[in-house]
């Protein structure tokens, strides 16, 4: 077992010399797509769908006029 691993088997955040174990560039882009990009696309999609519902409430079958 490596000295760098914690009791739960995961690697620590810092090396023994105090340097970060993972560079900040890789820490935010480890997955296939960066999380900020997925969150931005998801948030935009939610706002778009809500906009469609609000538009539909003012026009079409559900309008008061």
UniProtKB/Swiss-Prot annotation:
The keyword Kinase does not apply. It is found in: Cellular thylakoid membrane. GO terms for cellular component: photosystem II reaction center; plasma membrane-derived thylakoid membrane. Keywords: Membrane, Photosynthesis, Photosystem II, Reaction center, Thylakoid, Transmembrane, Transmembrane helix. Pfam families: PsbJ. GO terms for biological process: photosynthesis. InterPro entries: PSII_PsbJ, PSII_PsbJ_sf. The chain crosses the membrane at residues 35-55. Belongs to the PsbJ family. PANTHER family: PHOTOSYSTEM II REACTION CENTER PROTEIN J. One of the components of the core complex of photosystem II (PSII). PSII is a light-driven water:plastoquinone oxidoreductase that uses light energy to abstract electrons from H(2)O, generating O(2) and a proton gradient subsequently used for ATP formation. It consists of a core antenna complex that captures photons, and an electron transfer chain that converts photonic excitation into a charge separation. HAMAP family: PSII_PsbJ. PSII is composed of 1 copy each of membrane proteins PsbA, PsbB, PsbC, PsbD, PsbE, PsbF, PsbH, PsbI, PsbJ, PsbK, PsbL, PsbM, PsbT, PsbX, PsbY, Psb30/Ycf12, peripheral proteins PsbO, CyanoQ (PsbQ), PsbU, PsbV and a large number of cofactors. It forms dimeric complexes. This is Photosystem II reaction center protein J. It comes from Prochlorococcus marinus (strain NATL2A). The lineage of its organism: Bacteria, Bacillati, Cyanobacteriota, Cyanophyceae, Synechococcales. The gene is psbJ.
């Amino acid at each position: 077992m490596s000295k760098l691993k914690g009791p739960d088997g995961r690697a620590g955040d810092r090396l023994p010399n105090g340097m970060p174990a993972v560079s900040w560039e890789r820490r935010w882009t480890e997955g296939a797509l960066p999380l900020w990009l997925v969150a931005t696309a998801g948030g935009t999609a939610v706002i778009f769908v809500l906009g469609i519902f609000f538009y539909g409430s003012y026009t079409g079958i559900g309008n008061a006029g």
